Curated annotation (Swiss-Prot):
It comes from Pseudoalteromonas atlantica (strain T6c / ATCC BAA-1087). SUPFAM superfamilies: Thioesterase/thiol ester dehydrase-isomerase (SSF54637). Homodimer. This is 3-hydroxydecanoyl-[acyl-carrier-protein] dehydratase. Its main location: cytoplasm. The lineage of its organism: Bacteria, Pseudomonadati, Pseudomonadota, Gammaproteobacteria, Alteromonadales. One of its GO terms (biological process) is unsaturated fatty acid biosynthetic process.
Amino acid sequence: MTINQDSFTKEELLACSRGELFGPGNSQLPAPNMLMMDRIVKISEEDGEHGKGVIIAELDITPDLWFFDCHFPGDPVMPGCLGLDAMWQLVGFFLGWCGGPGKGRALGVGEVKFSGQILPTAKKVTYKIDMKRVIKRKLFMGIGDGEVSVDGRVIYQAKDLKVGLFQDTSNF
């Protein structure tokens, strides 16, 4: 099922987390609290630095977000692994949006660099994935480069984010 839409609201992302957007058994986003975005502001198969597609999403930051209470008490900061997971979530969403069948699983990342942090005083996180390759064979797989920005400043960069869609995940 291909979706002819170039942006998605929070309600639509929640529908995706329930398996309602791309059809049963296909790509899903995680439910809150692990859903790491509030909206997708752009998704395209043609754009991006490599001409293979781009997806841009945003997360509104408020001091009451769950991870600030536990990471770290007295020194609240969003865990970097959540930003990395958000980028994998977006690659999987891109594959489902392209009509790929199966359930998404992160397969790896080539390189990750952290050069900043997300504090409770921040306003907005922006995720951007530039797709490098989409393989549409027995295994539907996407490879992309990503970045995480906080209030307009790039603070994480990831190269070669890999996500695959699988018909059967029982032996994964």
